[in-house]
Amino acid sequence: MGLLECCARCLVGAPFASLVATGLCFFGVALFCGCGHEALTGTEKLIETYFSKNYQDYEYLINVIHAFQYVIYGTASFFFLYGALLLAEGFYTTGAVRQIFGDYKTTICGKGLSATVTGGQKGRGSRGQHQAHSLERVCHCLGKWLGHPDKFVGITYALTIVWLLVFACSAVPVYIYFNTWTTCQSIAFPSKTSASIGSLCADARMYGVLPWNAFPGKVCGSNLLSICKTAEFQMTFHLFIAAFVGAAATLVSLLTFMIAATYNFAVLKLMGRGTKF
């Protein structure tokens, strides 16, 4: 078998939807977790530098930020493992579907995995194919563990609902920083607003970031404009935007996973001719 033919067979058996979704998932989670972690750190510095001089005022906020950062560590680890499992499940179900439709130009791993669903035969032994059959046996064992695509569909559906809430929550800091930036623009260009510059403020207490008895709790006028011009504010604002984009990319990847897995499961269930799940 030539190299070109081998590559062609691998491409035919590859689950492209799962591959794209996996890449998008890893990219989105990395963007969300990395940028979100640094954005929370930047927010902590801005609060303690400009909005409150008393540590007790923002002690609870710091504890919440640190808790969210630990959650981010766990989220990154979980999605790395779950994304790899979903990719393996994509190879598994795609190989089984192609075998049902009579397309045997699948990869060795795809054949090994699909054998656990369709009851296909194992490869014929030979000295030259010893390594190939070893890989097939490993994939066959993996297929027994992955042989519940309906459960993967259910778990992915529940995870998508949870991540939809995460996506909505990731928009909150973007909204707060955007409002602050808009206020700064009004201060920088007073001709665009009828309000006096001194009355234009950013109040962290209004968003529940600080308690109402925090002092000063808000920054107004030219002081607020100077904060908006700092590199810390600009970087934190853009990091939250990047984290929001990462959450959106992860949501799209989960939807892609769910659609592809549901389609493959439906095909196997309806056309598997006695397939057992």
From Swiss-Prot:
Pfam assignment, any one: Myelin_PLP
Residues with PTM Phosphoserine: S114
Keyword terms: Cell membrane, Disease variant, Disulfide bond, Lipoprotein, Membrane, Palmitate, Phosphoprotein, Transmembrane, Transmembrane helix
Record localization: Cell membrane; Myelin membrane
Effect after changing H37P: In shaking pup
Lipidated positions per record (O-palmitoyl serine): S199
InterPro entries, alphabetized: Myelin_PLP, Myelin_PLP_CS
PROSITE patterns noted in UniProt: MYELIN_PLP_1, MYELIN_PLP_2
GO molecular function, a single term: structural constituent of myelin sheath
Main location: membrane
Membrane topology: Multi-pass membrane protein
Disease: Defects in PLP1 are the cause of 'shaking pup' disease; a dysmyelinating disease.
Name of this protein: Myelin proteolipid protein
Encoding gene (name): PLP1
